[in-house]
Amino acid sequence: MAKYSSKINKIRTFALSLVFVGFIIMYIGIFFKESVLLSSLFMILGLLSIGLSTVVYFWIGMLSTKAVRVICPGCDKETKVLGVVDMCMHCREPLTLDKGLEGKEFDESYNKKKMSK
């Protein structure tokens, strides 16, 4: 079985990686001190990456406030569920809001909307 984590944590990790990528891009710009154009370009690209991470953090914060809070049966801690199926943030227990999916193997494809005929 593949390693899963909660959707909120995945998006937060992506936003954090954007911050570090932005710093690395800006650091690369230091090596081009002789060329003002290249140095400025790398600094602006790094700043855009950090700005994008701020937007992602804001978006996941808004999304997190709308997430359904449930008590995980595995660890008895409160966690948030985005979509029909998700993982517990604390113990990675598969969670579902759909009674028809209880007992089935965890699959993130259950969150995708099915095409209606």
From Swiss-Prot:
Topological type in the membrane: Multi-pass membrane protein
Keywords: Cell membrane, Membrane, Transmembrane, Transmembrane helix
Chief subcellular location: membrane
Cellular compartment(s): Cell membrane
Transmembrane segments: 13-33, 41-61
Cellular component terms (Gene Ontology): plasma membrane
InterPro entries named among the record's database cross-references: UPF0295
Keyword RNA-binding among record annotations: no
A Pfam family hit: DUF2614
Domain of life: Bacteria
Family, per entry: Belongs to the UPF0295 family.
Listed HAMAP family: UPF0295
Protein name per the record: UPF0295 protein YgzB
Top-level taxonomy: Bacteria, Bacillati, Bacillota, Bacilli, Bacillales
